[in-house]
Each structure stands twice: as structure tokens, then as C-alpha cells.
Amino acid sequence: IDLKKLQTHRERTFNQPPQRRLASPSSALKFVNIRGFVYFWPIKGIDLPSLWTAVAGNHPVADKHDDPGHITWGWKDGALDKRIWYYAKILRKKATMISLDVAPYFYALSENYGSPDEDYLLAYEEGRLTQSAKQVYETLLNEGALNTLDLRKAAKLSNAKDSEFNKALEVLQADFKILPVGVAQAGAWKYSHIY
């Protein structure tokens, strides 16, 4: 494979040239649907398309919230309850957007075999699901959608380390058991995903 041709192809299909940059939520949806799946942010060492790169070009994600690329954040959050794509931390437990046409193929590769009420118990018994992840999942099964602060409290993980709770959320997302469905104005930052 000619590496220069490969790089040119990537730049074009990842929408990196300035004239191909995405400028609207509808163009973002089209981008995801054409690619099948994209990362939300660029992932170091992984040459796959990302929404950020398709909007802002091939430069690092800016820390400043006024960077033009951060418009992707609003597009993603605004679409969580619209069911226009499947968004969760899936590939490498990183934020991934999957076309609804392709999502069933990803799900088929997961370790879900039948019933959402039973699969997690099998995973727990086999040691593939932590106690914390089990508590989070059971809380959502019993309580329905909750923002992360209320979910943490209801799952009796208020005293758990942040990393333990966040890992539980990531594991459940990566296995297609939960996904964010909205954003609540909760917590110190007035920003909390609803699962």
C-alpha cells in the first residue's frame, strides 16, 4: 500500500480538508451514517475518523471551551434523546457514534445473548462484570433513567472512588447494556449524563 495515497484517502474520508469540514448537526449525522461509526474525539494512535476532526481539522482537542471544534459537544448532547445514532463509550471504551444501520452488527459482537434481565447476571457470575457495574445496572433496571449523580447515590456507590463508578459506566456501555440518553443540569458543573 502506498502510504501517501493512504494518508490522502484518510484526509478526504475523515473530512480533514477545510472545504470538507462539517458545519451542522445534519452534516454530522450524514458523516456518521456514511462512515458507519466514528469516534467522538480523535484517539491517539488510532487512525479512525472522529467527529472532532471532521469539524475542526487535524489538530489536538482544545482545552478552551470557545474553540470552534467544541460545537461538536452541543451536537452530540442535543442528539442523545433523538435516537439518530448510537452513542456510548464502546470501542476501547471511548466515546463512539455508530450509525443505526450498523449498530445491530456491533451488538451482535457483544456478550448479550438474550434477556437484558438475565445476561448481566451470567456476566457477573462468570466474573466479567464487577460488583459496582452490577449495582449500577440493577439500579437502572429498577429505577429507570437517572442522571449520574442520582444513579451513583441510588446504586449505593456514593462512597466509592470516582474511578470505580466511572469504570462501571464504561464497562456497561462497552457491552451495550446502557447508554447516555440525555443531559441533566445537575452537580457542580450543571452537566450530568442521564443513563
What are these regions (language model features)?
Residues 1-195:
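Long, low-complexity intrinsically disordered regions
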